[in-house]
């Protein structure tokens, strides 16, 4: 389903395709974590610093990097946990390490995001890029997240499958052009980590709300990520099962802020929307399907202190 706004009679602007808004932390899987894992920089249980840090470059150089609820926990945390709590400090550290390893500030965009249809923009190379400062559309985010759900393969979103004339002759037929962006191993690690984001509920109550509406639907294998921007001007939630990816953005057209309950409203809206679709067609979400780790992924016991 495509919902471009609250009331088409009042406003015909399609927010799903045309509204360009800052992605907030919802960009982190595609820009930071996926590329870092693919490059061999880290694994899901590697440790990253969440100690207080300051911006090194840009107009905010010397100012503290701020997480949603603190200026750092002054600890090290696993990569998985840093995604669960959406640590801006940890994500920035990973992004900087990726720069140093690959020697290119545009590495993540050139090798990954550009292949998933994200718009070209100088801000992808900013130190603050992991905080989601680049404007994207809901369609961009849906396409990006479905790449992980599709074993690392990007399939461009489309609406029209085919067009036929009155005689039944096919005038147009959509042709898929899949692009392998991430390896199957990386994609499976990312879905495993994003499952923790939804299950642990440190940034969204979506899991509880959807489970309360329908137990079977709540027990689907949900993975996803949240995002918000300054003053809650933008609130994002993108979720996937092995069958479908759904993205949600909410905010004001005039870019004014909202309030700290924005994430709760987004979780509620998404849960109720998904439940309504599910009650209409229970096959859509593949509630009995599960994401599996690729056979190429190696499991090992790691130290809680060193990763």
Segments the model singles out, each with a brief description of its role:
Residues 33, 107-111, 220:
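Short glycine-/small-residue-rich flexible loop motifs, especially phosphate/cofactor-binding loops
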Residues 22-48, 82, 144-148, 190, ...:
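Active-site SXXK
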Residues 14, 119-128, 216-219:
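Short, conserved helix/loop micro-motifs enriched in His/Cys and acidic residues
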Residues 39-43, 55, 90, 98, ...:
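A generic secondary-structure signal for well-formed alpha-helical elements
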Residues 42-109, 126, 166-196:
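Conserved catalytic neighborhood of penicillin-recognizing serine enzymes
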Residues 1-19, 137-143, 147-307:
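A penicillin-recognizing enzyme superfamily signal
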Residues 1, 46-49, 81, 91-95, ...:
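Structural recognition of the beta-strand scaffold that forms the well-ordered cores
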Residues 18-27, 133-136:
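Gly/Ser-rich catalytic serine loop of serine hydrolases
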């Amino acid at each position: 389903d495509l919902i471009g706004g609250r009331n088409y009679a009042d406003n015909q602007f399609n927010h799903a395709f045309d509204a360009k808004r800052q992605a907030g932390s919802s960009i982190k899987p595609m820009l930071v974590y996926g590329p870092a894992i693919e490059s061999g920089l880290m694994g899901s249980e590697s440790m990253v610093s969440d100690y207080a840090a300051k911006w090194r470059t840009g107009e905010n150089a010397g100012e503290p990097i701020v997480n949603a609820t603190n200026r750092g926990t002054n600890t090290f945390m696993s990569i998985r946990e840093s995604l669960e709590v959406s640590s801006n400090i940890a994500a920035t550290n990973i992004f900087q390490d990726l720069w140093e390893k690959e020697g290119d500030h545009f590495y993540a965009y050139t090798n990954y995001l550009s292949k998933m249809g994200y718009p070209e923009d100088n801000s992808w190379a900013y130190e603050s890029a992991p905080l989601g400062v680049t404007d994207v559309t809901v369609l961009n985010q849906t396409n990006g997240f479905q790449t992980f759900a599709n074993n690392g393969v990007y399939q461009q979103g489309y609406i029209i499958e085919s067009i036929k004339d009155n005689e039944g002759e096919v005038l147009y037929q959509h042709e898929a052009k899949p692009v392998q962006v991430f390896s199957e191993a990386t994609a499976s690690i990312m879905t495993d980590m994003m499952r923790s984001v939804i299950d642990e509920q440190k940034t969204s109550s979506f899991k509880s709300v959807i489970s309360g509406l329908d137990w079977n639907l709540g027990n689907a294998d949900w993975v996803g990520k949240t995002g918000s921007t300054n003053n809650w001007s933008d609130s994002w939630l993108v979720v996937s099962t092995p069958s479908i990816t759904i993205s949600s953005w909410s905010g004001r057209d005039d870019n004014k802020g909202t309030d700290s309950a924005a994430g709760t409203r987004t979780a509620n809206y998404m849960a109720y929307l998904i439940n309504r679709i599910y009650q209409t067609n229970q096959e859509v979400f593949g509630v009995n399907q599960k994401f599996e780790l690729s056979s190429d992924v190696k499991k090992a016991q790691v130290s809680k202190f060193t990763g």
